[in-house]
Regions:
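Glycine- and acidic-residue-rich phosphate-binding/metal-coordinating active-site segment common to enzymes
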Residues: 111-136
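Anionic, Ser/Thr-rich low-complexity intrinsically disordered regions
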Residues: 104-111, 115, 122, 148-157
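A conserved mid-domain beta-alpha-beta active-site/ligand-binding segment of alpha/beta enzyme cores
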Residues: 143-148, 157-159, 173
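C-terminal peripheral helix-coil segments that are non-catalytic and often amphipathic
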Residues: 131-140, 162-185
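Hydrophobic alpha-helical connector segments
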Residues: 60, 71-105, 125-127
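Helix-turn-helix
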Residues: 14, 18, 22-56, 60
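N-terminal intrinsically disordered/low-complexity leader segments
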Residues: 1-7
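Solvent-exposed, amphipathic alpha-helical segments
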Residues: 14, 18-26, 72-76, 98, ...
Length: 185
């Protein structure tokens, strides 16, 4: 990842904001760097100066969204419970509902799990969270074990996000099955 200088910071923020807006409106694949530059009120050269590629923009957005999802879950449960396992269940449930609510959000989740850079961000951040949440219940597991389990649960999450709810796989079943097949047996 390139060094982020103070002079690059305002441009990066504008570009990230523009990209997020376009990705949610048109989808990742239908949002070009040229469109992002126009929305950010800059040129494509500036986008290339701030980010090496569109996937790098995606990685930054994934990091931001990931942190915000966990922040939101913390706020939802604040004063209700300190149960970290319930925290995991609620966070996963939020992901499923958010993807079901909007096709561009579904695509963003799918794209994020598909590209190696953004998937790595998810795997690493989620491994930290899983270890933080489940270490007391699974003290024999090392970081690598949580990482392996995250790759498995990410595969399940990606597939559940990719397939919209239907008459055979409605949201309640999707949530229950995800929890049942990951850490919440």
């Amino acid at each position: 990842m390139p060094v982020i200088t103070a002079e690059k910071q305002p441009a990066r923020k504008r570009i990230l904001h523009a990209a997020a807006k376009l990705f949610l409106k048109h989808g990742y694949y239908n949002s070009s760097l040229k469109m992002i530059a126009k929305e950010a009120n800059t040129n494509t050269g500036s986008v290339g100066w701030a980010f090496k590629a569109k996937e790098e923009i995606l990685c930054e957005l994934v990091t931001y969204v990931f942190d915000k999802q966990f922040e939101t879950t913390e706020k939802l449960l604040e004063g209700i419970t300190d149960d970290r396992v319930l925290f995991f269940a609620v966070e996963a449930t939020l992901q499923l509902y958010m993807a079901e609510a909007n096709e561009q959000v579904r695509e963003m989740y799918n794209v994020s799990y598909s590209f190696s850079g953004s998937a790595k961000v998810i795997y690493n951040k989620m491994t930290e969270k899983l270890q933080e949440i489940f270490k007391e219940y699974l003290p024999q597991l090392k970081t690598k074990d949580f990482y392996e389990r995250e790759i498995a649960s990410a595969g399940i999450m990606r597939n559940f996000i990719t397939v919209p709810c239907d008459m055979y796989f409605e949201m309640g079943r999707k949530i229950h099955t995800f929890h049942e097949t990951t850490f919440l047996e």
